[in-house]
Amino acid sequence: MNQISSDSRQALEIASQRAELAAIIEQYCSTDGTHPTPIPGLTFFRHAAPSAAACAVVKSLFALLVQGAKRVVLADEVYEYDQRHYLITSVDLPLLAQITEASPDAPYLGLALELDARQIGELMSKMPHFLPSTATVSRGLAISEITTDILGAALRLARLVATPEAIPVLAPLIEQELLYHLLSGEQGGRLRDVAIKGSQSHQISRAIQWINQRFTEPMAIDELAGAVSMSK
């Protein structure tokens, strides 16, 4: 009997997890668009056709696709991601986003979970090896390859939409598990940025919020820097 390699087993597990998560999202989303769920901060989305590029300010979040593909542009950098990847934004960012792969037979499906700085900070306090280093903060958006641990936690969280009575008890525990795996992964540094008050990422996020609130008003760089505790 042929031995199934570890990589093959992992690929089969990811395919099974992805198929179940896609079924949950499609069952919940009867129409195209963004659909909030009963779980605070968790959103499902579905689109049956590619979209034009559109500007949006995206909150700090974790997002993954189970079907379809998307292009995200941040400044002069272009990011392509699909069902093989997850996306992390560690600050509120102005992005140009476009769904590049979707059809009625295979709609664009995915989920997004807003990142809670308090929740991440509490988890970090229990895990000393997750304490931030003095390394410089990188760009606040990144895409990495999905893992069975991350996809499995996201799937368990999504399953809870069918049992609303379990959400208050189980959702925080599953979210903590998901955050643990994200902190342990390639983009752990970006999650740590979310929890660091006064970090460069935190200041950038505050600056974007400050500008959004005063979009139609004249502003001075000195005033902006003072409002978010940044140097010019």
Q: What are the residue ranges of the model-derived segments?
A:
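Inter-domain helical "communication" segments and dimerization helices
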Residues: 126-129, 166, 188-190
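A short, Lys/Arg-enriched amphipathic alpha-helix from helix-turn-helix/homeodomain DNA-binding modules
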Residues: 144-162, 171-175, 179-183, 188-231
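A ubiquitous short alpha-helical element
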Residues: 53, 82, 137-145, 195, ...
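Alpha-helix N-cap/helix-initiation sites
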Residues: 55, 167-172
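N-terminal regulatory/effector-sensing and dimerization cores
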Residues: 34-131
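Aromatic/histidine-rich interaction motifs
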Residues: 123-153
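A short, N-terminal "cap"/entry segment at the start of jelly-roll beta-barrel domains
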Residues: 1-38, 43, 51-52, 134-141
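Long, charge-rich low-complexity segments
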Residues: 3-9, 110-115, 218-232
